[in-house]
Structures are given as structure tokens and as C-alpha cells.
């Protein structure tokens, strides 16, 4: 189980310095946190000069603390007219402050500085501050040009699980004598695996143990004058005297032309369009229907919420990461003027038995889930909130709800602006890569419909076929929805899920569903499906009577989910199955990082019923992989959804030839 997050306690010394009672050490120099950040970390890493004329620049910090190093770096980036296009700041923190404590600490520090541009940034940071849950949290500022990737957890555990290429290291944290683990050889070896060949570092300490650990990990150091009269601090470069890593950190996809094809204009594809366009890519979106979001993404509404499991398994962690990331992306779209229809009053998940409710309640307590993510609801509380009878209690997801998938897809395409070209009513039959390295999307006649440096297949169950994948087992699952006329179902004020779901729509109409019918290809709504949905609704909300309505007279809709055999999505760079077959004998014990890849070919499919939760995170992962940016989730989670995972399993069992 993932360790729960224990927040930091905010304490000020008499001189105004923020201090940690847990570690018995100060968060910053009494001479000034922001001035220290500038002298030690910014100037110590040769910034801002080193990020100039770079498309993207990545900094890793080993302790976020009060956020002053990030705030000072952000302000320096803003003040530099020649700054890099995109600044990535990745920071690890075992004990993050709660939002309002962070606001107080940073505001207090800023109040004693003459660096005036920083003051407005404090509220921006605090307002974006995430729920204190383990894992990776990505925040964007300045229209996405500045990205803060927070990693909540023990650095010893999380640093080896990051995927990125670092250009500078801010080695901060409590003194080695107070928190020796953060300065251990294991930490520096993890950092060395993430370092760009030109990476630099800076730290306020000149401890002998730190110097030895740096040297062992391949970092060359030198002493320079410290901050505020301190005799010495350390700066240096990554300069290994030997080969220190089996796998190089990720690089950007190399191309002179930043154009891409996305096949499939549902939730998966439109999310990718928006993320690539935000990075300056010109995208051609190809959809076989006459309009976007016409298939499963064309449902009147979909629900969104994280999954919670007592053991905090991979699926639960992925859903939590996807849910929180989606909320951030949707808010950014709304701030940019690309509004779409979604509920904002929460979502209730009801248990199907008293025993299940007890397990749900215990899971919340055991995991330390913050109330802003989920809280337990007794049966009486659920009755009062939903204004109708329920059989059992459950969970309240305060930020969950329902959304119009088609409206979201339209907002994402609108955000792409003139970087998006659409081709509709055309079905792609296959892909081929030319001698010039560019991909061509061909129709059934062999005509080239579009060509680009990069292709993302996001067309659900057809993706594997178009990409020529033999080792990507997916299945179509029929899902029938039922629309209930006004007044025919309990008027719940917010979406309710459990065994099925009920969503209040406009004009008093209620949406309920959905059936789960593997390998059924009938696209016509059936009376039996409506009857099944009505019976499920009756179990969910006992005040409803399934026999009160004529199932044969109801309206509905059929969509088809695409589900992988392990129920996780397929997201990221695709494996080169032909190359793997040629090298099969050498790859029997391969890991995912050893598998040959289809250069410039990516996938975003197999989202099943969780497209709203997973699509935004999947799109961000693909965009980060293409542009060589820090990944927005742990490598362990990225590998769990790597499309090549099935190829690796086949190689291990000798099934690739």
C-alpha cells in the first residue's frame, strides 16, 4: 500500500524563519529565503543564462519546502526576455504543507523581500496546490509555459521512479546532520540516472559526506562562496568517469517538422490534440464519422471519479492520478474561455451491501484520503444529500460529477485553434513509414490521406489493427444507456453510482445505465437492455420502481467501450513488433525499456469506461514523451499502461516470431 502523506507543521521562529519541529531545522537562511534561492540555486546553476535559447529546460529539486526556490526561479524566468519556451520544475517533498499553511509561509517570506515580482505568484501557487495524496501532481502556470511537477513521497522511493532528463539540480532540504537519508549515496545515484550530459547542480552545504556521495555518483564539484557570509557551498556538473547507467533518460523525438496525425476524434484523440497543439505542434485530426465525439464519446453525459482500493493498487493509483490531472486540465480550459458542460456539486458512490460500506469506510481511514478527494457517507447522510431513500451508505467525491464528453472534446479542439486541421468522414485503413521518416495514413484504396512526423492512434478497438499490432489484446464491449422522461425517476441533485449509475440531465431527463455486453456488436437499443438498466436503478435507488415504466417505449443510446485484457489503457509509444521478432532470442528477458519502439508512433486507447478520468493524463504523457519532457506520472504507472507490455509478455513466453 502507498504510504499516506503526513503534512508538515507550520512553525515560525522569533526571527520569522520557518522551522520544522519534526527535523529540528530551518527551511531557509535567516538572511532571506528568496535571496538564498537566487544566490545558491539559480546563480549556482548558471541561470538564467543556461536556459536561454532552449526549447525546454528541466530543474529537479530535492525538497520543495515553502516553495521559495520555485517562486524565485519562476520570477527569474519571467524577468528574462530570452528565457526558454517551457520551464519544467520538478520537486520532491515527503512532508508537504497544507494549502493554507503553504500560503502563510510563502506570503510571510515574501513580505520581507524586495523582490517585488514574487508576491503575486504566491497566491497562484497556493490556489493551484493539490490534494495531499501520494504521487505526481502537475501544475501549470503562465499558460502552460511554466510547469511545476510535485512528487509527494519519500525521495528514496520516488526518485528512482521518475522519468525525465534534468538540466539542473537544486540539492536542497534539511541539513545532512538532520536528514541524512536525503543526502545519501542512493539519492545521488538516482539523480545521476536522470541527468542530462550537461547537467549542473548547486547546494548550500559543503559537507564531506555530501562531497563523497556526489563523487561516487559521477558529479564533479567545487567550492564557491556561500550565502550570507557562509564560507562555502558546492556547485558542479555531471561528469561521470565511467558508464553509470544502462538506460539513458528520455529525449525529445527528433524532427525538423513539428506536425502530427491523430486518428480518432473521441475523448482520447481530442485530449491529445489539445496537448500537442499547446506545445506548438500542428495536428491533423482524422475521424471516420462526420463529426467529432460521435461514438462512445457521444453519450449525453459521463461520470468522473477516482477509484479507491484498500491496497491502493495500480488501477486505483492511475485513476487518482488521472482524476486529479483531468480536473486541472479542465479548469485550465475554462479559464482560457473554452467552457463546456459539467456538474460541480460532487458525486456519490453507494455501497451494494452493509459489508461493502464498512470496507469502503475502512479504506478511506486506512489510506488517509483527504476529504477534498473523498469522504465516507453514512446511509442517513446519503439520504439527506440525495433527497431520496438509499439502501446503504457510500463515498462522496466532492470534486466528482458528470460531464458532456462531446462538449469537452469540442472545447479541446477549440483550444488547439489554428494548429488543428480536421478530416472527417474518412476511415484510415493502415499506416506506413516512408524512407523520409514520415508517417502516412492511408485509406482502403491506398491513397495517402495525411502525412506527418508523428502519429497517435486513438480510435479505440480499431487502433491496434491500424497500427499493425498483434500483441495488443482489446475487446469491444457494448454499453446501452437509457433516458428516463421527467418525473419518472427520483430527482437526485447530483450523479449517483454503484451497481450502475444515474445522472440528472437538463429539463428533468434522467440518464441511467449501462449494460456491459462483451463482443456484442448490435448498435440498436434493445428493450432488454432498457429493462436491465431499470432494474439496476431500482437497486441503486429503492424509491424507483422498475415496473412503473414501459421499457419498450424508452429512448436510449448504444456505445462501444474498448477494453484491454488487463483492464488498463494502452498509452504511450508503441513497440516495433517487427524489430522485436527479429531480435526475439535476445529479448526473452527484456524489460519495457529494452523493447524496440516504432519511432514516432504512439497509442491512446483501451480506456474502457474511464475515458473521462484517463484521457487527459494519457494525452499529457504522450506529449511529454514526444517532447522529452518530465512524465506526468511515475514510471511504474507509465509502464503499467505501456502499449508494449503485451509484447514483453509474449517475448518472455516465446510467442513472438
Swiss-Prot record:
Sequence intervals crossing the membrane: none
Q: What main location does UniProt list? A: cytoplasm
Question: Iron-sulfur: present as a keyword of the record?
Answer: no
What's the domain of life for this entry? Bacteria
Task: Provide the residue span(s) of the region labelled tRNA (mnm(5)s(2)U34)-methyltransferase.
Answer: 1-239
- Which EC numbers does the record give? 2.1.1.61, 1.5.-.-
Among SUPFAM superfamilies, the record links this protein to: FAD-linked reductases, C-terminal domain, FAD/NAD(P)-binding domain
Q: Which GO terms describe its biological process?
A: methylation; tRNA wobble base modification
Looking at the UniProt record for this protein, which Gene Ontology cellular component terms does it annotate, in alphabetical order? cytoplasm
Q: Where are the residues of the annotated region FAD-dependent cmnm(5)s(2)U34 oxidoreductase?
A: 263-657
Which reactions does this protein catalyse? 5-aminomethyl-2-thiouridine(34) in tRNA + S-adenosyl-L-methionine = 5-methylaminomethyl-2-thiouridine(34) in tRNA + S-adenosyl-L-homocysteine + H(+)
Q: Quote one Gene Ontology molecular function term.
A: flavin adenine dinucleotide binding
Where found in the cell? Cytoplasm
The cofactor required is: FAD
Key words of the record: Cytoplasm, FAD, Flavoprotein, Methyltransferase, Multifunctional enzyme, Oxidoreductase, S-adenosyl-L-methionine, Transferase, tRNA processing
Among Pfam families, the record links this protein to: DAO (PF01266), Methyltransf_30 (PF05430)
Family per record: In the N-terminal section; belongs to the methyltransferase superfamily. tRNA (mnm(5)s(2)U34)-methyltransferase family.
Main function? Catalyzes the last two steps in the biosynthesis of 5-methylaminomethyl-2-thiouridine (mnm(5)s(2)U) at the wobble position (U34) in tRNA. Catalyzes the FAD-dependent demodification of cmnm(5)s(2)U34 to nm(5)s(2)U34, followed by the transfer of a methyl group from S-adenosyl-L-methionine to nm(5)s(2)U34, to form mnm(5)s(2)U34.
Query: Per its record, how is this protein called by name?
Result: tRNA 5-methylaminomethyl-2-thiouridine biosynthesis bifunctional protein MnmC
Species in which this protein is naturally found: Burkholderia pseudomallei (strain 668)
Encoding gene, per UniProt annotation: mnmC
Amino acid at each position: 500500500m502507498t504510504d499516506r502523506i503526513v503534512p508538515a507543521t507550520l512553525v515560525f521562529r522569533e526571527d520569522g524563519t520557518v522551522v520544522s519541529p519534526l527535523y529540528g531545522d530551518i527551511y531557509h537562511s535567516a538572511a532571506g529565503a528568496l535571496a538564498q534561492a537566487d544566490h545558491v540555486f539559480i546563480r549556482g546553476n548558471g541561470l538564467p543564462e543556461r536556459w536561454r535559447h532552449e526549447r525546454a529546460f528541466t530543474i529537479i529539486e530535492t525538497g520543495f519546502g515553502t516553495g521559495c526556490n520555485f517562486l524565485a526561479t519562476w520570477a527569474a524566468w519571467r524577468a528574462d526576455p530570452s528565457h526558454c519556451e517551457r520551464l519544467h520544475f520538478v520537486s520532491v517533498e515527503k512532508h508537504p504543507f497544507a494549502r493554507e499553511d503553504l500560503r502563510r509561509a510563502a506570503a510571510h517570506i515574501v513580505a520581507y523581500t524586495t523582490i517585488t515580482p514574487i508576491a503575486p505568484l504566491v497566491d497562484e501557487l497556493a490556489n493551484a496546490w493539490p490534494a495531499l495524496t501520494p504521487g505526481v501532481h502537475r501544475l501549470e502556470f503562465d499558460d502552460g509555459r511554466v510547469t511545476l511537477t510535485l512528487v509527494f513521497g519519500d525521495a528514496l522511493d520516488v526518485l528512482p521512479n521518475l522519468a525525465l532528463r534534468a538540466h539542473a539540480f537544486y540539492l536542497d532540504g534539511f541539513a545532512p546532520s538532520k536528514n541524512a537519508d536525503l543526502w545519501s549515496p542512493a539519492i545521488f545515484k538516482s539523480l545521476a540516472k536522470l541527468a542530462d550530459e550537461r547537467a549542473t547542480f548547486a547546494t548550500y552545504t559543503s559537507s564531506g559526506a555530501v562531497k563523497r556521495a556526489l563523487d561516487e555518483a559521477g558529479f564533479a564539484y567545487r567550492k564557491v562562496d556561500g550565502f550570507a557570509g557562509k564560507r562555502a557551498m558546492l556547485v558542479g556538473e555531471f561528469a561521470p568517469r565511467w558508464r553509470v547507467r544502462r538506460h539513458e533518460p528520455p529525449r525529445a523525438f527528433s524532427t525538423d517538422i513539428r506536425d502530427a496525425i491523430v486518428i480518432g476524434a473521441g475523448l482520447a484523440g481530442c485530449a491529445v490534440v489539445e496537448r500537442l497543439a499547446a506545445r506548438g505542434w500542428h495536428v491533423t485530426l482524422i475521424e471516420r464519422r462526420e463529426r467529432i465525439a460521435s461514438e462512445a464519446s457521444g453519450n449525453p453525459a459521463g461520470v468522473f471519479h477516482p477509484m479507491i482500493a484498500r491496497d491502493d493498487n495500480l488501477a486505483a493509483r492511475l485513476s487518482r492520478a488521472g482524476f486529479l490531472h483531468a480536473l486541472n486540465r479542465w479548469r485550465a480550459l475554462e479559464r482560457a474561455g473554452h467552457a463546456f458542460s459539467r456538474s460541480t456539486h460532487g458525486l456519490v458512490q453507494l455501497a451494494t451491501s452493509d459489508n461493502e460500506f464498512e470496507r469502503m469506510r475502512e479504506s478511506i481511514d486506512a489510506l488517509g484520503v483527504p476529504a477534498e478527494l473523498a469522504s465516507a457517507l453514512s446511509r442517513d447522510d446519503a439520504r439527506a444529500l440525495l433527497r431520496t431513500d438509499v439502501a446503504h451508505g457510500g463515498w462522496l467525491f466532492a470534486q466528482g460529477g458528470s460531464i458532456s464528453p462531446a462538449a469537452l472534446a469540442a472545447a479541446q479542439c477549440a483550444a488547439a485553434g489554428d494548429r488543428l486541421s480536421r478530416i472527417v468522414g474518412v476511415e484510415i485503413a493502415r499506416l506506413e513509414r516512408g524512407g523520409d521518416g514520415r508517417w502516412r495514413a492511408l485509406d482502403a484504396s491506398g491513397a495517402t490521406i495525411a502525412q506527418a512526423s508523428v502519429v497517435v492512434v486513438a480510435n479505440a478497438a480499431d487502433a491496434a489493427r491500424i497500427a499493425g499490432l498483434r500483441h495488443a489484446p482489446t475487446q469491444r464491449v457494448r454499453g446501452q444507456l437509457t433516458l428516463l422522461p421527467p418525473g419518472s425517476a427520483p430527482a437526485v441533485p447530483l450523479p449517483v453510482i454503484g451497481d450502475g449509475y444515474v445522472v440528472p440531465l437538463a429539463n428533468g431527463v434522467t440518464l441511467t445505465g449501462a449494460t456491459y455486453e462483451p463482443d456484442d456488436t448490435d448498435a440498436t437499443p434493445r428493450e432488454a437492455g432498457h429493462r436491465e438498466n431499470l432494474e439496476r436503478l431500482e437497486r441503486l435507488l429503492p424509491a424507483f420502481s422498475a415496473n412503473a415504466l414501459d421499457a419498450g417505449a424508452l429512448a436510449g443510446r448504444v456505445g462501444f467501450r474498448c477494453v484491454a485484457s488487463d483492464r488498463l489503457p494502452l498509452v504511450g509509444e508503441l513497440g516495433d513488433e517487427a524489430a522485436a521478432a527479429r531480435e526475439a532470442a535476445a529479448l526473452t528477458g527484456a524489460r519495457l525499456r529494452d523493447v524496440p519502439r516504432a519511432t514516432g508512433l504512439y497509442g491512446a486507447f483501451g480506456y474502457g469506461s474511464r475515458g473521462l478520468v484517463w484521457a487527459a493524463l494519457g494525452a499529457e504523457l504522450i506529449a511529454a514523451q514526444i517532447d522529452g519532457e518530465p512524465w506526468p506520472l511515475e514510471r511504474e504507472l507509465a509502464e503499467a499502461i505501456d502499449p508494449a507490455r503485451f509484447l514483453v509478455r509474449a517475448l518472455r513466453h516465446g510467442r513472438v516470431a
